[in-house]
Amino acid sequence: MHGCRTATTGYYGVITGFMTNLTNLEISKPEEYSQEAVDALLDNVDESQKFATSPLYSTSYSAVTPKDEQVKQPTIIYVMDESYWDVSELEQYGITFDTDVSKNLHALQQTSAYGRAYSPSFGGGTCDVEFEALTGYSVSFLPSGSKPYQQHVTKPMFAMPNYLKLKGYQTAAVHCFWAKYWSRDKAYPNLGFDDFISLEDMHGVTKVRKHYWTNGLVTDDSMADQIIQQYESMKSSSDKPIFLHAVTMQNHTNYNKDNYPDDERVKVLSHPAGLKPAPWARWKILLPASGMQMPCWAN
């Protein structure tokens, strides 16, 4: 196993670590859980609320494009920016910054549909967040301390990539860290990814934050180049619509002052300084997509 699972073994030994991890494998069935109970809950839901039929945003593609002209299978670029959030929201609590770290994000919001989501993790434990985003399942219902990719995604299961493959999509994942970390190399195929591009496959990328991370972390800008490169490769090799999932690393914990030069720091923490490049990288991904003849969802 890779990731934080090795910490238990390192501190307490192989046997204790192994036995501890065994307790995370079994998911207990909730009391009174049955297909009949689920059907009964659905019967209490208004029929109009079961399936959304109206656009969520008045300016969205589905709202402004006639239904008979809409592309049914858009390109989907699913980007998870490590630990990214709008820190400018802290200003309502009296916290100020030396620079506008959310300027690019706010510019993106002017031309995009957007909303809010709550993450099950912060600064790390990325496989928990990925698992929720790709499957719709909550890690809250897994045994405490378990990591889904290592202990529960051990065979093909319902997930967005598998579902989209049934709809004719080609699928790929891009992550700028080692393939075996969190057992992504084993979990991704079970989720439905045809290809997985990891750090081992990336050459000539720019890295930062070498004070804490010995070999550094790939920048969001370089990661954007990798995403574009993979998109172009998929586009040229097949006529199938594209689903591309990508996970960045630049703003991963640990957040200490030695990770950033003086001109990139702000008053409160070094974490906000790492947030600045992320929206620009998103712009970079959207620029080539804007020339396509079909809509592109870059989340």
Map each language-model feature to its residues.
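Solvent-exposed soluble domains appended to multi-pass membrane proteins
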Residues: A52-K72, Y78-N299
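Transmembrane and membrane-interface helices of multi-pass
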Residues: M1-T9
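Helix-hairpin-helix/helix-loop-helix acidic hairpins
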Residues: Y11-V71
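A feature for loop-to-transmembrane-helix boundaries and adjacent hydrophobic helices
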Residues: H2-G3, F18, H211-W213
